């Protein structure tokens, strides 16, 4: 795992087309902004895991949203 330190307003690049910018820090929460092409899916981990679980269940939702 690559570990980076960024300050508010600073950006990191993932490949040539994805940028992640630190928008703010408040306590133990960090607000980030992600710019990516339409064809690149961007999800919070818990949402991604739910999507993967639903794919495994034949697309049937298995929990509350």
From Swiss-Prot:
GO terms for cellular component: cytosol. Pfam families: CsrA (PF02599). SUPFAM superfamilies: CsrA-like (SSF117130). Its main location: cytoplasm. The keyword 4Fe-4S does not apply. This is Translational regulator CsrA. It comes from the Bacteria. One of its GO terms (molecular function) is mRNA 5'-UTR binding. The keyword Cytoplasm applies. Belongs to the CsrA/RsmA family. Keywords: Activator, Cytoplasm, Repressor, RNA-binding, Translation regulation. NCBIfam families: csrA (TIGR00202), PRK01712.1 (NF002469). It comes from Vibrio cholerae serotype O1 (strain ATCC 39315 / El Tor Inaba N16961). It is found in: Cytoplasm. Homodimer; the beta-strands of each monomer intercalate to form a hydrophobic core, while the alpha-helices form wings that extend away from the core. InterPro entries: CsrA, CsrA_sf. The lineage of its organism: Bacteria, Pseudomonadati, Pseudomonadota, Gammaproteobacteria, Vibrionales. GO terms for biological process: mRNA catabolic process; negative regulation of translational initiation; positive regulation of translational initiation; regulation of carbohydrate metabolic process. A key translational regulator that binds mRNA to regulate translation initiation and/or mRNA stability. Mediates global changes in gene expression, shifting from rapid growth to stress survival by linking envelope stress, the stringent response and the catabolite repression systems. Usually binds in the 5'-UTR; binding at or near the Shine-Dalgarno sequence prevents ribosome-binding, repressing translation, binding elsewhere in the 5'-UTR can activate translation and/or stabilize the mRNA. Its function is antagonized by small RNA(s).
């Amino acid at each position: 795992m690559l570990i980076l330190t960024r300050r508010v307003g600073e950006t990191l690049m993932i490949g040539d087309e994805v940028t992640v910018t630190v928008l703010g820090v408040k306590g133990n929460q960090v607000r980030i902004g992600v710019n990516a092409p339409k064809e690149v899916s961007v999800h919070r981990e818990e949402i991604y895991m739910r999507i993967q679980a639903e794919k495994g269940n034949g697309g049937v939702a298995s929990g509350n949203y």
